[in-house]
């Protein structure tokens, strides 16, 4: 019988749909490392079912998921070969490392296993880059080309719609002259986002990978009776080892010290990664004290505004999100020492 924390599909399906479809939005395509997140999710699920087979699960189900992952990883005509190879390689490294940490760390919580798998995958990726045929510089060029390719696709779609409906577009721009510059503004925005995405690619890839592992873990425990560990806890209970604050401190030190300028890229990525982790922890604190429905509605409205296509609305929403994320980060970082959730939760 499923554990209490493993019942229900509604929230899981919403999270899964967001993980699969939100990266298809133009602005997110321009900055996120993995656009087709199914490449991260399915191999991780296959790893879970393989470990589940070892723990007494059904062999046929494990073979089916491994076959699906193998089919997904198979190179197909029409895919950008260089970036697709990097994407597949990372997915397989991550899934293999996660399976290993699940086998060897039976008593560890999910986040510790996922973080361990991420560390192993990063170490192996760097080692393969140093000793293999694809150095880091070549990988960076491949990633930059992929971002350019995505942005070109987006702009081709926008310009194609405008070209197919010239009369309607002329009517709109005559009534609202500011719309005439919208395609150029969107292209400029996408280019800026891609520059940022290239700079912090490792940290964003790490965050996407952690989300994929969390989803794979949750889906597995909905579908299988062979337990691999405790269920994923709600966001309001999310916390991690307080010693991880040193990762944030190391990143800040590298960025601020002039003598470590050669490692500034590493420092930026450490800051982005741990900033995001502490912001999520802060969101957990907020959800602990506030109504989850109000939080979800606020975030939903903000996302609609952020991707509305109107520059001034987007800027307003972006400013609001940055303030909200900073407040969440401060709460999450403060939770390291204050442990807000040990305080009495308000009943009103």
Q: Where in the sequence are the language-model features?
A:
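Short helix-perturbing small/polar motifs within transmembrane alpha-helices
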Residues: 73-79, 88-129
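Small-residue-rich helix-loop
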Residues: 227-282, 288
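Membrane-interface interhelical loops and short interface/amphipathic helices
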Residues: 130-196
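Extracellular/periplasmic helix-loop-helix junctions in multi-pass membrane proteins
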Residues: 258-271, 288-332
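Alpha-helical transmembrane segments
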Residues: 7-22, 61-71, 246-252
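N-terminal signal-anchor module of multipass membrane proteins
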Residues: 1-53
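Central hydrophobic cores of alpha-helical transmembrane segments
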Residues: 61-70, 113-123, 296-308
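Selected alpha-helical membrane-embedding segments in polytopic membrane proteins
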Residues: 174-233
């Amino acid at each position: 019988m499923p554990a209490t924390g493993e019942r229900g599909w509604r929230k899981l399906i919403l999270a899964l749909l967001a993980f699969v479809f939100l990266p298809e939005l133009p602005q997110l395509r321009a900055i996120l490392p993995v656009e087709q997140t199914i490449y991260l999710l399915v191999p991780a699920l296959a790893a879970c079912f393989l470990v589940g087979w070892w723990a007494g699960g059904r062999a046929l189900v494990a073979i089916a998921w491994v076959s699906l992952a193998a089919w997904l990883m198979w190179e197909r005509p029409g895919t950008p070969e260089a970036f697709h190879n990097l994407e597949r390689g990372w997915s397989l490294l991550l899934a293999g490392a996660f399976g290993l940490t699940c086998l060897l760390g039976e008593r560890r919580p999910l986040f510790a296993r996922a973080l361990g798998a991420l560390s192993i995958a990063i170490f192996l990726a760097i080692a393969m880059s140093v000793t293999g045929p694809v150095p880091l510089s070549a990988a960076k060029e491949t990633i930059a080309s992929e971002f350019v390719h995505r942005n070109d696709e987006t702009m081709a779609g926008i310009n194609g719609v405008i070209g197919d409906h010239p009369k309607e577009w002329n009517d709109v721009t005559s009534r609202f002259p500011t719309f005439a510059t919208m395609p150029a503004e969107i292209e400029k925005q996408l280019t800026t986002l891609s520059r940022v995405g290239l700079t912090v690619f490792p940290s964003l890839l790490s965050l996407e990978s952690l989300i994929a592992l969390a989803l794979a873990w949750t889906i597995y425990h909905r579908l299988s009776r062979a337990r691999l560990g405790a269920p994923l806890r709600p966001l309001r209970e999310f916390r991690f080892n307080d010693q991880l604050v040193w990762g944030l401190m190391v990143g800040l030190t590298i960025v601020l010290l002039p003598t470590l300028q050669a490692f500034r890229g590493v420092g930026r990525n450490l800051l982005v990664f741990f900033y995001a982790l502490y912001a999520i922890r802060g969101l957990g604190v907020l959800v602990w004290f506030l109504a989850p429905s109000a939080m979800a509605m606020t975030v939903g409205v903000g996302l609609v505004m952020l991707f509305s296509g109107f520059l001034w609305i987007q800027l307003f929403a972006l400013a609001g999100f940055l303030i909200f994320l900073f407040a969440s980060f401060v709460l999450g970082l403060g939770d390291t020492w204050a442990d807000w959730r040990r305080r009495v939760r308000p009943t009103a």
